Design a protein with these regions (language model features):
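C-terminal SET catalytic tail plus cysteine-rich post-SET Zn-binding segment of SAM-dependent SET-domain
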Residues: 5-6, 118-158
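Eukaryotic intrinsically disordered and solvent-exposed regulatory patches
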Residues: 18-19, 52-58, 132-136
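Intrinsically disordered, compositionally biased terminal peptides
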Residues: 1-9
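Eukaryotic short linear interaction motifs
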Residues: 19, 64-65, 77-78, 142, ...
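Catalytic cores of histone-lysine modification enzymes
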Residues: 39-121
């Protein structure tokens, strides 16, 4: 299966107001933080979760049940995931049935930075549906971190 943007860092893929390609470099999504915020209303910055690394934040209100983004990366089967991660746990792998996406080395989507609020004082305010992230039925206020449940399979042996 084809992969999507499997590079550690790249030039921003957004266009400036003058129609030129942005010259900023990005390592977290396909767009630099300026264009990610402008085009999607999202930011990647440190999480409020202790040990959570980076988190996905909104800069504008997200309506109830609104698509936040798609989980993208290297497309794999569960068997391929098991072969790759024999000695370590997959941190950025999301599976829906036998279809899996490994976003460990991709920067095509900021959705991979949504953390799970399990075991914290925060509550999940978004949900994964297949390989897409949607806001919960109440929506998400502006300037909040986006949390989603990873599912019980993720938490086995952690």
């Amino acid at each position: 299966m084809p992969s999507q943007s499997v590079k550690e860092c790249q030039r921003c893929n957004a266009l400036t107001k003058s129609g030129q390609r942005c010259k900023n470099r990005t390592c977290k999504s396909g767009k630099c933080w300026v264009h990610l915020k402008r085009d999607t209303g999202l930011r990647v910055k440190p999480s409020q979760v202790s040990g959570g690394g980076m988190g996905l934040w909104t800069t504008k209100r997200i309506k109830p049940n609104q698509l936040i983004g798609k989980y993208t990366g290297e497309r794999m089967t569960k068997a391929q995931v098991n072969q790759r991660y024999v000695t370590r746990k997959p941190q950025y792998v999301l599976c829906s049935g036998n279809r899996c996406v490994d976003a460990r080395k991709t920067n095509s989507s900021a959705v991979r930075f949504a953390n799970d609020a399990r075991g914290t004082r925060f509550k999940n305010n978004a949900r994964l549906k297949g390989l897409s992230l949607k806001s919960a039925s109440k929506g998400i206020p502006a300037y909040r971190e986006i949390f989603t449940g990873y599912g019980s399979a993720f938490w086995v042996n952690r």
